[in-house]
Amino acid sequence: MPLLDTHSRVTHRPEPGFALLALVQATLIFTITLVAVPLPLIGVEFDLSTADLVVLQIAYGLPYSGLLLLGGSLTDRFGGTNLMRTGLWTFGLASLGAALAPGFDTLVAMRGLQGVAAALVAPAALAQVAALFPQAEDFDRAMARWGGISVLGAAMGTVLSGIVTTWVSWRWMFLVPGVVSALALLTERWLLPKVLSKDRGQSLDLFGAGLALVGFSAGGYGLAMGSETGWDAPSVLAALVLGVASLTGFAWHERRADAPLLPADFLRDKGRLAGAFGIFLAAASMGLVTFILAIYLQSGPGWSPLATAGAMVPYLAVLILGGGPSGQMVIGMGTRNAMILGLVLSAIGLWLLAGFGPNYVVEILPGLVLLPAGTSLVFAASAVLMTQGVSPVRMGLAGGVMNTAMELGPTAGLAGFMALASLRTEIEAGWSLVFMSAGGVAFLLAVSACFVLKRLQVTGAWK
């Protein structure tokens, strides 16, 4: 059984260390959406097709989601400190490379390398949080806040990218994750405990990691490109078949592997499974809002990038102001009730956004206020559900699964919902159908949570 050697250099309150980890986590999610607003400008500079822009959009999320389970396994084996340092160095250098990219191919490669690095950092950061808050009650409170941090990062990417690209080049956006990486590397020695694993003898499931990477990447690519090039395109069909085959092989292999990346019994817990679905849907909803509104406001009413970013400020404000109360509500009213309330609010917000139009105050703003209020609760409750009952030596696995759900939302989830838009001849009618459908899924999950989480209990640490 792995042992965790946690030698803390933190002699004061853990809040500064948690703040640093929160900044890192928000930046990892921020990096997903930082290209949302400047995509048209990048397309003009490099003379890109719509399909090229889709590739650029998903180049970060696909390796991130595909390698997170391996990142969790590496964290449990080598410890959060070593993995986070390695990941931050790589993340920072890749961000600098993206800022200086001379062409499209280099930019896509650097976005992909950012995703690889993020897959190391995310589960390692969660292991550090567990070391900062060793008491179960304190850790649950921390995780309730942690869930809201991720959704905040996504909204900040959309808002800041619009502001930055209005005044300077889009390339400056990639310096933000580079600066955060440097700050974390300079300060973690004094703010964070040293988390090292003593058991390095257990073999790594590299074959399973390869299947997961190919499955998530190929499947996500096929879903993303299907709506652009057509679902009958040979490249799309090949990617989807490869993705399904790889993920099927992954599931079969994990049930038989000696040291699986994702032990079969981990997601048998109803709470963890509900948390994974909640995170996936909330992340997909966020992706829908930022993607659709960023395109609509610039191509429909003809708003500037700065005005488009300004349109998302209320969304960001609700996330900032609601982050603390959401965590308190999860602890006060319980994860089940918080999850149900959050899903219902999210559903109503998405349904309101289905009526989007040029009148921002009447047709967009109400949904932009209600949706983040709901997703904040969903993320906070889901983060607690995903980590309750997990022993500290397996927190890397929990972080890997949680962040995989987070990354699949804006990639595979977004692509899956956007595929529904092709059922309508008019693009705006298709987008309205997407919002309605996402709201329907959120409401169905809320109803399901009423029964699935009715007798939720934590029976002990998952080892």
Please report, for each region that a protein language model flagged, where it lies by residue:
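12-transmembrane solute porter fold
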Residues: 14-37, 50, 167-168, 234-242, ...
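Structural signature of transmembrane alpha-helices in multi-pass secondary transporters
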Residues: 21, 28-29, 57-60, 64, ...
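Glycine/proline-centered helix-kink
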Residues: 36, 123, 145, 150-162, ...
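Extracellular/periplasmic helix-loop-helix junction of adjacent transmembrane segments
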Residues: 36-67, 106-107, 301, 306-311
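Membrane-interface helix termini in secondary transporters
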Residues: 41-43, 72-73, 77, 163, ...
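Central cavity-lining transmembrane alpha-helices of secondary-active solute carriers
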Residues: 58-72, 122-126, 313-326
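Helix-loop-helix hairpins in multi-pass membrane proteins, especially solute transporters
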Residues: 80-206
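C-terminal membrane-cytosol helix-exit motif in multi-pass small-molecule transporters
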Residues: 178-197, 213-225, 241-257, 445-455
